[in-house]
Amino acid sequence: NTGPVIVIDGAGRVTLDGGGVRRILYMNTCDPELVWTTDHCDDQDHPRLTLQNLTFAHGNATGTAPDGGGAVFARGGRLKVVNSRFENNICDPLGPDVGGAALRAFDQSGDLPLYIVGSTFGGAPGRGNSCSNGGALSASGVSYTVLNSDLSYNDAAGNGANPPQPGTPGGGSGGANYNHGNTFHLTVCG
C-alpha cells in the first residue's frame, strides 16, 4: 500500500502463476497488520488497484482464511480488472458461501462497483476455474459491472445449496458468478 493508485500492467506478456499451491494476489484493507485510514476498514478509498493485460493461472485458495479467491482476493479499496485472463484457479470445492475461484471481493469503498472489462474467466475446455460457489466470481456486498467479458467453462462444484440443506456440505451456486448480501447490483453487457 505505497500509494492510492496502483496499476499492475502485464502488457499481455505476464502470467502470474500460483503453481497450484497458493493464492496469487491478496488485497485486504481490513488486515490487522495494515494501517487503517478510516473508522471502518472497508471504507478506505485506497488502494485503487487496476489489474490489466495479465494472466492469472493455477491459483489455489483451498483451506485458506479468508476463503475463496483462488487467484485474487480483494476487500476494501477499489479493484478493476481489464483485458486479463483467469485460468485453472481453484478454491474449496464444498461449503456454503465459499466462492470465487478466480476472484472474490468483499466491500468496495463507497459501495461502488467492481469493474471487469474485456476479460476471460475460463473461456475454453480445460481452462475453467472451480470452487464451491461462483466458479469464476464471488462477491459479498459488492456490485459487479462486467463488460465485454467471457465467463465460460467454470464450475460451482459444491452441492446442497446455500445455506446448506441438512446432510449436505452446501454450495453449488453460480458456475460463473455467485453474489450475496443485502444490496448489490450485477450488470453484464457485451
Regions from the language model: what does each represent?
Residues 71, 99-102, 115, 133, ...:
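Ordered hydrophobic segments in well-structured contexts
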Residues 18-22, 60-67, 90-99, 125-135, ...:
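Short glycine/acidic-rich loop motifs that flank beta-strands on beta-rich extracellular proteins
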Residues 1-7, 15-52, 60-78, 96-97, ...:
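Extracellular beta-strand-rich solenoid/capping regions of secreted or surface-exposed proteins
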Residues 9-13, 46-60, 78-92, 110-128, ...:
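Right-handed parallel beta-helix
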